[in-house]
Amino acid sequence: DRNTGEDKPVTIGQLQRHAVDWLYENRVQPFKRAASTGKKVAVIGAGPAGMSCAHRLSMLGNQVTVFEAKEKAGGLNEYGLAAYKMVDDFAQKEIQFILSVGGIEIKYGQALGKNVSLAKLRKEFDAVFLGTGLSGVNALEIPGEDLPNVFDAVDYIEGIRQNKKQRVGKKIIVIGGGNTAVDISVQSKLLGADDVILAYRRGSEQMGATWKEQELAQKNGVLIKHWIKPVQIKGDSKGVTAMEFETTKIENGKLVGIGERFTLECDTVFKAIGQVLVPKDLGDAPELLSIAKGRVVVDAEMKTSLAGVFAGGDCVNGGTLTVDAVQHGKVAARAIHKMLGGKNG
């Protein structure tokens, strides 16, 4: 009522966090599992999609085994979000909260194609959910991309999150327009970089980063340059020294360069232009699954082309928001439960 009276929006995110923090601090578990169905489901990947699916399946009485390639669960919430956005080991607290409902086991160091086989899982479990995420990085496809001190933003952020000593340059250029580009830009400033330029080939309205994220970057001293695209990275065996750009515009609905070029000095370049699905993400699955445009093809219930195999999250939509991945997991869990003869999914 107070917010309404002052014509201010309700801060839904803060309200949700207040409620969740109270549950965590008081170790209250409001969910209760249904009676056991006797069914077993394998979930590949302990990110938002996988853990959402596992939680809903467990709530419905199914036994779930989660196979996670890394040493910790959480996916990009644990490894890919900037450190300044996360507090008090929140991702791991969330995982423990999910596990406390019961019926979920996580096996770490288990990756498709290495020590986990989709064919074997299909035989041992009643259903399988793929939430593998994306491990490949889009290439700039320009000269100099392989020079020292050209980094993938997500990998660099992962190093920071896992308390690895990460060197930060003084003059940094970030290529991209999404939230990850903002994350690495702001994180670099917080780590002591003198100048950080975020370069994006289109305008601010076309950026994947929200207005709030763009504003956050600018408040932290990040200079955002629009309508420029990278042409080449200059440097030598010791590292990067500069980056050449060309100004761009939209012509007949397509992005084109207009011939005007300029160079910006830098000692570090971060690529934040999205991740892609690569064969190793799916182990032995690519030969079996329907893949289109670098994504696993699913229907409205998150079913893949393989009977009994479902998928969700970044490997399906190419990488959007956490809430989308969580919703994928919920939808898949209901469909799996229904397929296995369950009710009230």
Positions of PLM-derived features:
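Iron-sulfur cluster-binding cysteine motifs and their immediate structural context
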Residues: D1-A19, T65, G103-I104
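Residue-level detector of alpha-helix initiation sites
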Residues: E6, G47-A49, K72, G178-T180, ...
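Glycine-rich dinucleotide-binding loop and its adjacent helix/turn
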Residues: H18-A35, Q96-G109, K114, V137-L191, ...
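Feature captures the FAD/FMN-dependent oxidoreductase FAD-binding
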Residues: A35-S36, K40-I44, Q92-I142, Q232-E244, ...
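N-terminal Rossmann-like FAD-binding beta1-loop-alpha1 element of flavoenzymes
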Residues: K39-T65, A181-K189
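Rossmann-like dinucleotide-binding cores of NAD(P)H-dependent redox enzymes
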Residues: V66, K70-S100, I106-K107, I160, ...
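FAD-site-proximal beta/loop scaffold in flavoenzymes
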Residues: D146-G169, N252-G319
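A conserved FAD-binding loop/helix module that cradles the flavin
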Residues: I184, C315-K343
